[in-house]
């Protein structure tokens, strides 16, 4: 009886509304003191939210079911066709868990925040619920609203608690992300009103629609721009290094760990799932853009002398594998893209947290001024080394498995011609080779070499404290666990990914056989698969 009650519990609505509702309790806390009560309250709410998302996975989610589960559907504004529709399938559940997990650690990372702690933790909790909502909603208009909701906390967290150029970085972030979001609204309205006067924005309804080719291309291009900004895709990426360059450590963790994954998830959910004919035509472009991301960002990261910007460009490079996986038309490659999002969420959060912790001690981000601090911070060096090895895809860690899955899935799948696969894989390998070069050289510059006397004398360089070790340990544990046994994560989404890929392969086969790509470059790259 208890099990039946738990299975009927509105897990997803609770995981969205609980942190947002709890955030509105924070203004009633007293302003006196250092904000200790607010910190403990925010941490408690974030941990409970994480437990709620874990409960949704344990009590109501079937990993063998490819369909949307844990569905909650309440008519909200029927005249506008808007419903409170939430649910989770294999593509959203891992990211919901990742969001609540990273947010809880980000709250712990924000423990030293002394300036306006009430507002800071209020925004973090609102952001927690908003980001979970992005992955859980099953209505496209509601998706747009939640997509916009999480922009406000990020903007304020950058503009108020950022570095010297925080206003510029925050303004650039909001212009890029909010400006590109208009394409989501236009696509939602076009798809919701398609062929009817009564709008319906639910994903299940849109997936059943037979959108014509030109309509799909129109929506696909707009959504690719909007989601490409968030992923980000070169050349829509320039907001990210500026945002990371000014953000504090907990905001870093949320940006790298969760925000970028929203773009990859949305490409899978909308472009690949709802617009399969257009996806068949644009998938080769995604492959090319993914390779450009990997090489360009790796080269740029190699040249950076600012620690935050170096890691920011490294993130852009790693997200290129997500693009390749999404465009691969391979179950293995697309599964690798999903795993790469989870893996990079953990690795990116760990690296950016360490960047913040290192800056708190050295008060500089310039690599030229950091040499020789390893003698004073040996535990910090060990943490940096472990997380850097994870980022360069060391075997036994999650990054290795996800990148290998993407490469293998793309290269071995026969949807693309052999020359295209060989050329793209060879170019992407350049970025893979560059990654250990710039990461290991970064470690050498920070921790080894001749000590900077000015830095050593002026700063009391203390080693990592227990709170910092605990945060990194919490991130490294799943990184290593996934690296050793990937099925911990892949089993949760493989049924949904197989269903998605089958749908896209059918579109490719139909498109090629009907000469839909006749006279285009795509026609020379794609060939009809055997299904």
Swiss-Prot record:
Localization per Swiss-Prot or TrEMBL: Cellular thylakoid membrane
Statement: the UniProt record of this protein carries the keyword Translocase: yes
Predominant location: membrane
GO terms (BP aspect): ATP synthesis coupled electron transport; electron transport coupled proton transport
The entry's keywords: Membrane, NAD, NADP, Plastoquinone, Quinone, Thylakoid, Translocase, Transmembrane, Transmembrane helix
GO cellular component: plasma membrane-derived thylakoid membrane
The keyword Transmembrane is annotated on this UniProt entry: yes
Catalyzed reactions per annotation: a plastoquinone + NADH + (n+1) H(+)(in) = a plastoquinol + NAD(+) + n H(+)(out); a plastoquinone + NADPH + (n+1) H(+)(in) = a plastoquinol + NADP(+) + n H(+)(out)
A molecular function GO annotation: NADH dehydrogenase (ubiquinone) activity
Top-level class of the enzyme under EC nomenclature: translocase
Enzyme Commission number, as recorded: 7.1.1.-
Membrane topology: Multi-pass membrane protein
Cross-referenced HAMAP family: NDH1_NuoM
Role according to the record: NDH-1 shuttles electrons from NAD(P)H, via FMN and iron-sulfur (Fe-S) centers, to quinones in the respiratory chain. The immediate electron acceptor for the enzyme in this species is believed to be plastoquinone. Couples the redox reaction to proton translocation (for every two electrons transferred, four hydrogen ions are translocated across the cytoplasmic membrane), and thus conserves the redox energy in a proton gradient.
Protein name as catalogued: NAD(P)H-quinone oxidoreductase chain 4
Species the sequence originates in: Prochlorococcus marinus (strain MIT 9301)
Gene: ndhD
